[in-house]
Amino acid sequence: MFERNQKTIFVLDHTRYFSIASEEYISMDFLKGKPSADGGATGAAGNATGGGGSQFSKSLWTCACESSIEYCRVVWDLFPGKKHVRFIVSDTAAHIVNTWSHSTQNMSHVMNAMVMVGVPSRNVATSSDYSVIHGLRAAIEALAEPTDEQLAAMADLGTDELPRIPNKGRVICITSARDNTSMKSLEDIFNTVLVQQNALAAPPAKKGLVIDHCHLVILNIVPLGVESLVTNRSLLKISPLLDVEIHTVSAPDISYKLTHLILNHYDLASTTVTNIPMKEEQNANSSANYDVEILHSRRAHSITCGPDFSLPTSIKQGATYETVTLKWCTPRGCGSADLQPCLGQFLVTPVDVTSRPSSCLINFLLNGRSVLLEMPRKTGSKATSHMLSARGGEIFVHSLCITRSCMDEAPSITDGPGGRVSDYRTAELGQLIKMSRMVPLKVKDPSAPPLARRLPRYFPLTTSSSILFHLQRHINWLPHFLHILVKEDMDKQDEVRCQQHIHELYKSASRGDVLPFTHTNGARLKLSKAKDQYRLLYRELEQLIQLNATTMHHKNLLESLQSLRAAYGDAPLKSEPGASLLRSYTESPLSPERLEPITSGSASGSSNSNSLLKASKRRMSSCGQRSLLDIISSAERSQSNKRLDFSGRLCTPLGQVAKLYPDFGNKDKDSVVTAASITPNVKEESVRS
């Protein structure tokens, strides 16, 4: 509830140095005169006449006051009554401009107080009594004072639970220091006073609230064109109670710096509305396009954008932060079907409230009109992502849903990657989830972990990837048979019933009956004989029984099925117990087999099916005996055996290091090699001649 941006205190340096000019001169033209020829030139402070106009320059104090008041205006516009900002002016003493009371948290009170303070006088002699430290001490004392919200929380909790009330804050000090040493001294004094204040707030004194944490931002401002010896520094943790960051900025750019800081302090975002059609002030018959920058919560963009959208950003001239550019959308008539649902609304305030484009946009919205804003898609098209409208004298930005919303129908599960799939076993998956459901018990059930590991091991996602589960739609007794197989408490009667069903399959295979399924993935099953179909069915059935062989009745069923397979001419090879289990939940019986190369003499259909079954059996019997590391290691060894090993490894004794290029640099060896390379060339020349 009480965040760090709940309390913000501005400490303004009111010493003599802040009375000097900022050295940014502004041309002021008379109504009936012409603009001065050197309107943008710089000169001495004061009035400089030239042509038909004059120039003036703001003082450092004026720049600091204007930018800090704009900061608090943005805060109070976007968080009315929720965030508090105080001002303290420091010269020979600390002057409190306003308090935490809501009656002083408004623009009129602050501006009237600043007018009474006035610009620092240049006639005052320089003295050590003029210091910003007075204001920093008063700021720490102000942080210890409770706000109205904290007072209400204290009343609810009671005086015994005061330490539970969070109390964090931020102090923004606008001053001017000579060098880094002076800035370091300022940090140390602030940290010392902060610790002393917490000591006073602790029992038994209890003078105010304990400050949990403080964020000190020091803005070192200088006139335009003046180099400062104070270096910028990012956020640094001085102590568990204090974080400090330092920014050196010229006086004309302090407003951009504070706008940049307020984005991070209050989690805001900048949006520039571009291409706003507006009548020109001097020519009412023509119009021009203008841009207006507004500030709002960052969530206005984050909840709108999806993976198909990218925010168009740009950096304003003179600023250091990014702003999102959204285009003004010409109002058009649309029905209810064209309106997007609103994901959220957030208060909006313009950056430059006194400019003519901002004033025109605000009046346009306050008169009951709405503005749609467009953002580009990655595909090149555009989408209406935001809407500006006003209600009750306040302007809001509405984030519109440009992606699939929760009110839209969910995408079909059949339209997945790889094409359209229409035979997902959704009902069976629901039954599996019900069977795998666990409930908390006071005493641990030792049978629960095996159940969780056993049930999901073999579950084909689609009907077309399994013969056994495909046939349960066509064979009446098969669903009940599969249900009995997964029972943990199978009895003798269930075993006899299952054996009868297995014998029925054997009799059907003996008669040569074709299994009652016709299509797999929309095409006919490519098996030449009914015998091959039964072999695949027996194989999958054996895998399923092995997974559920938890009782003696399951093992009897497994032995009965294996004996039938042996009588049928498809006896399983002996392998490790883990081989078939690994095969059961890694591949389905209809997965493509890795066939051996077929010679020209064995290209018949029956030999193809036999090789299919043999390859499948070989893979089932051997895949569980080798791990992935064994497979990769054997592949690397087979590749390394194809080429000779490094001679240094072969010739160097164990424990010694082989020397690369031992003959490199040996002149005798080089001469021998050179002579050996020249001799064949001489022989070739003699042969050619």
Swiss-Prot record:
Keywords: Cell cycle, Cell division, Coiled coil, Cytoplasm, Developmental protein, Differentiation, Meiosis, Mitosis, Nucleus, Phosphoprotein, Spermatogenesis. Phosphorylated. GO terms for cellular component: cytoplasm; INTAC complex; integrator complex; nucleus; perinuclear region of cytoplasm. Residues 521-550 form a coiled coil. A motif (Nuclear localization signal (NLS)) lies at residues 613-619. Residues 578-619 are annotated as: Disordered. Component of the integrator complex, a multiprotein complex that terminates RNA polymerase II (Pol II) transcription in the promoter-proximal region of genes. The integrator complex provides a quality checkpoint during transcription elongation by driving premature transcription termination of transcripts that are unfavorably configured for transcriptional elongation: the complex terminates transcription by (1) catalyzing dephosphorylation of the C-terminal domain (CTD) of Pol II subunit Polr2A/Rbp1 and Spt5, and (2) degrading the exiting nascent RNA transcript via endonuclease activity. Belongs to the multiprotein complex Integrator, at least composed of IntS1, IntS2, IntS3, IntS4, omd/IntS5, IntS6, defl/IntS7, IntS8, IntS9, IntS10, IntS11, IntS12, asun/IntS13, IntS14 and IntS15. The core complex associates with protein phosphatase 2A subunits mts/PP2A and Pp2A-29B, to form the Integrator-PP2A (INTAC) complex. This is Protein asunder. It comes from Drosophila erecta (Fruit fly).
